[in-house]
């Protein structure tokens, strides 16, 4: 994370008159390993300004439960590799534990890589907050999303 990242982002948001709590900054676990004091300071500044912080791909790579305790995280995104295991006993144990833990820490839980109705139903049954994946839509460009949104909200 660059030295003045937080200050520059806040400045841009103010210049464009964007409501800060409508902005979600998505980070990966990898960024939390490097220069943790500097990263913590930047994330706290952004969070205090009203920007939401989302931790992407949780459970892969450099996961540490201490990140959830230390950093101001609003959204916890469960990696697709866990969602793919909703059919297995151990897979369900991991997903349910992540959902419960995140919610107890006042985080919204997002399941990534949802591809079928069985996954949606299971995630609903364990009170997962949000879902994303091909079941709902393939990745879209800004223009395609605008068209998609107009059709869905007629």
Predicted regions and their residues:
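EAL-family c-di-GMP phosphodiesterase catalytic domain
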Residues: 1-3, 22-36, 49-154
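Short, flexible, glycine/charge-rich loop motifs used to bind or transfer phosphoryl groups or to couple energy/partner
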Residues: 13-16, 41, 65-67
């Amino acid at each position: 994370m660059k030295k003045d990242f937080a200050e520059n982002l806040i400045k841009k948001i103010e210049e464009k008159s964007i409501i800060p709590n409508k902005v979600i900054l998505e980070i990966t676990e990898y960024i939390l390993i490097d220069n943790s004091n500097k990263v913590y300071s930047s994330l706290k500044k952004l969070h205090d300004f009203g920007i939401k912080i989302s931790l992407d791909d949780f459970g892969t790579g450099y996961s540490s439960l201490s990140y959830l305790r230390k950093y101001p995280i609003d959204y916890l995104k469960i990696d697709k590799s866990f969602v793919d295991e909703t059919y297995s006993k151990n897979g369900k144990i991991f997903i349910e534990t992540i959902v419960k833990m995140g919610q107890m820490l006042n985080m919204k839980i997002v399941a990534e890589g949802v591809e079928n109705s069985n996954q949606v139903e299971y995630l609903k049954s364990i009170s997962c907050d949000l879902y994303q994946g091909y079941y709902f839509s393939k990745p879209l460009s800004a223009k395609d999303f605008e068209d998609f949104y107009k059709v869905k909200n007629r």
